[in-house]
């Protein structure tokens, strides 16, 4: 290789990342216009386009590098020099942390995810921990109640860049003050002030004002979801001021925010104070930097592994027919491997399963589908694997495993947030907790369906319960669009004997679903059946599902709320907004 080529390659990779993040910011900056125009289908398409940008630009850089090197092979010393040059470019680079992830992605694409060593990759960052570059302007603005909270909130709202008229600004301000007074008390509120992010956070059909409520006893989140009426007027739907509420808004089961962040590390650090339960990976994920979130997630896994004496075990719950799932007992994530062979009733391919997981990545997850990170050639030390799990891996996924002696390499897996399987949760709870879980499950089904997602397999074992008590779907191998399903009523039996026959008396085609049958597997438990009939009986009617399909086909995009209906100002304070 010619001398100096290492620097050219390093510069080419960094320039490629510049191009990628520039397009990322360009797509993100269109969020305000899409919101103001109420172009919800464009919102959905922009989200998909932004997700695809990263891999597209990695591919462009890989082709450039193949041209630069004329396809010649490179030795280890050459690759180390490339990384050294790249590292020297980062100290003054504003997005150094994501640039390292981009370097990793280019390397993995070039070398087909082989030889993934710390010497060749940024397994951990080359820069000091939580180091930030000079911020050209503050991320947020402070507002003090020098003339009272009504004046303060009027200034906050007047500072917003949105160009639509407000339905009733004074009403919304009084709702916020009423909520804050109930939360803090009049005296504490008078001594508090706000710090509000300069950029709005856009997602689905809402623009979120994100801020900090700074009180004498600590800092609280201050979140205002701004929506539009059917007439295109703005209103504030609620005010959220607890870390639990903020955690759900920024949750792993929701689509990524569109927020203009030229310095993502600084924004992540600013958010950390109001989202103390979120990891660095989760914060990057929330603002749409999902590939760097994957890097941070892997680092969190390595740090945990280094500090524990645990072994991987099969994850609790009913064993899946498509995926082999394992975990570390104290770690909050699960590892999912597609089995070599599926149960006979699962007539699908591994490629189909991967396509389903990609669909979830790109779709609006409406707070009801867990996000995943996809890994190739994932290395595990044998000493960290329990004998029972090792036996299971070799039995169910041998084709995806390479034995390296002291290690194994799993060709492909997903990492996902660990939850309590809903079937286990339902066995353990009674009373109000049981009622809440069934209400949550039905709401999850409804919200997925409204977002054009049919889970396919609706058994409780395919859903999990988060630490906030939310029910989330996590088994995607039978997922499909609502519009692809044919929801049918079961025809009446022709003769009395029909109901006793082992085969149905009616024809069943691929894609046919009979909602009446849901009752058999969802209501078998006598504790659960009456709750279902009370709260979700319409889920057992085909006409309910067909009506949803019609709304989807007509282009209607449902509102998605990251909080309970009872928290909406219109419900809490009695005035309906429409």
From Swiss-Prot:
**Gene Ontology BP terms:** glucose metabolic process; glyoxylate cycle; tricarboxylic acid cycle
What one GO molecular function would you report for this record?
[isocitrate dehydrogenase (NADP+)] kinase activity
Q: Which reaction does it catalyse?
A: L-seryl-[isocitrate dehydrogenase] + ATP = O-phospho-L-seryl-[isocitrate dehydrogenase] + ADP + H(+)
Name the InterPro entries on file: AceK_kinase, AceK_regulatory, Isocitrate_DH_AceK
The reply to whether Kinase figures as a keyword in the UniProt entry is yes
Q: Which family does it belong to?
A: Belongs to the AceK family.
> What is the annotated role of this protein in its UniProt record?
Bifunctional enzyme which can phosphorylate or dephosphorylate isocitrate dehydrogenase (IDH) on a specific serine residue. This is a regulatory mechanism which enables bacteria to bypass the Krebs cycle via the glyoxylate shunt in response to the source of carbon. When bacteria are grown on glucose, IDH is fully active and unphosphorylated, but when grown on acetate or ethanol, the activity of IDH declines drastically concomitant with its phosphorylation.
Q: What is this protein called?
A: Isocitrate dehydrogenase kinase/phosphatase
Species = Escherichia coli (strain ATCC 8739 / DSM 1576 / NBRC 3972 / NCIMB 8545 / WDCM 00012 / Crooks)
């Amino acid at each position: 290789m010619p001398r100096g080529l290492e620097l050219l390659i390093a510069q080419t990779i960094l320039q490629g990342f510049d191009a990628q993040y520039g397009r990322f910011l360009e797509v993100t900056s269109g969020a305000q216009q899409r919101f103001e125009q109420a172009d919800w289908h464009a919102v959905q398409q922009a989200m998909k386009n932004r997700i695809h940008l990263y891999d597209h630009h990695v591919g462009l850089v890989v082709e450039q590098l193949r041209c630069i090197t004329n396809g010649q092979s490179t030795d280890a010393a050459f690759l180390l020099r490339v990384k050294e040059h790249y590292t020297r470019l980062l100290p003054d680079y504003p997005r150094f942390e994501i640039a390292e992830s981009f370097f990793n992605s280019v390397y993995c694409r070039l070398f087909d995810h082989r030889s993934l060593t710390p010497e060749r990759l940024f397994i951990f960052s080359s820069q000091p921990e939580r180091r930030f570059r000079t911020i050209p302007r503050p991320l947020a603005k402070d507002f003090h109640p020098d003339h009272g909270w009504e004046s303060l909130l009027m200034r906050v709202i007047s500072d917003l860049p949105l160009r639509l008229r407000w339905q009733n600004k004074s009403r919304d301000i009084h709702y916020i003050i009423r909520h804050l007074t109930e939360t803090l008390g009049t005296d504490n509120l008078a001594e508090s002030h706000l710090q509000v992010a300069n950029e709005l956070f856009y997602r689905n059909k809402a623009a979120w004002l994100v801020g900090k409520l700074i009180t004498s006893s600590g800092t609280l989140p201050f979140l205002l979801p701004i929506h539009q009426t059917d007439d295109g007027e703005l209103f504030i739907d609620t005010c959220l001021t607890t870390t639990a509420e903020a955690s759900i808004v920024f949750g792993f089961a929701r689509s990524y925010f569109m927020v203009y962040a030229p310095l993502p590390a600084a924004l992540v650090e600013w958010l950390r104070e109001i989202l103390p339960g979120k990891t660095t990976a989760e914060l990057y994920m929330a603002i749409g930097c999902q590939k760097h979130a994957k890097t941070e997630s892997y680092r969190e896994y390595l740090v945990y592994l280094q500090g524990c004496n645990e072994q991987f075990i099969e994850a609790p719950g009913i064993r899946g027919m498509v995926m082999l799932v394992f975990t570390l007992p104290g770690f909050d994530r699960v590892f999912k491997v597609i089995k070599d062979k599926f149960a006979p009733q699962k007539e699908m391919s591994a490629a189909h399963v991967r396509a389903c997981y990609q669909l979830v990545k790109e779709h609006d997850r409406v707070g009801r589908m867990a996000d995943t990170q996809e890994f190739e050639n994932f290395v595990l030390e044998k000493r960290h694997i329990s004998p029972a799990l090792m036996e299971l891996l070799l039995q169910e996924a041998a084709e995806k495993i390479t034995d390296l002696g002291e290690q194994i390499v799993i060709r492909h897996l997903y990492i996902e947030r660990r939850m309590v399987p809903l079937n286990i949760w339902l066995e353990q709870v009674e009373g109000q907790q049981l009622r809440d879980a069934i209400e949550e499950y039905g709401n999850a089904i409804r919200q997925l369906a409204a977002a054009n997602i049919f889970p396919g397999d609706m058994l409780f074992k395919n859903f999990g319960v988060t630490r906030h008590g939310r029910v989330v779907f996590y088994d995607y191998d039978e997922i499909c669009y609502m519009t692809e399903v044919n929801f049918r009523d079961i025809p009446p039996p022709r003769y009395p004997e029909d109901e006793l026959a082992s085969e149905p008396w009616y024809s069943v085609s691929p894609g046919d679903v009979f909602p009446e049958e849901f009752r058999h597997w969802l209501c078998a438990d006598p504790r659960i059946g009456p709750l279902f009939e009370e709260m979700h009986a319409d889920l057992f009617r085909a006409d309910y599902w067909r009506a949803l399909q019609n709304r989807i086909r007509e282009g209607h995009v449902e509102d998605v709320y990251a909080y309970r209906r009872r928290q909406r100002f219109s419900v809490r304070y009695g005035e309906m907004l429409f």
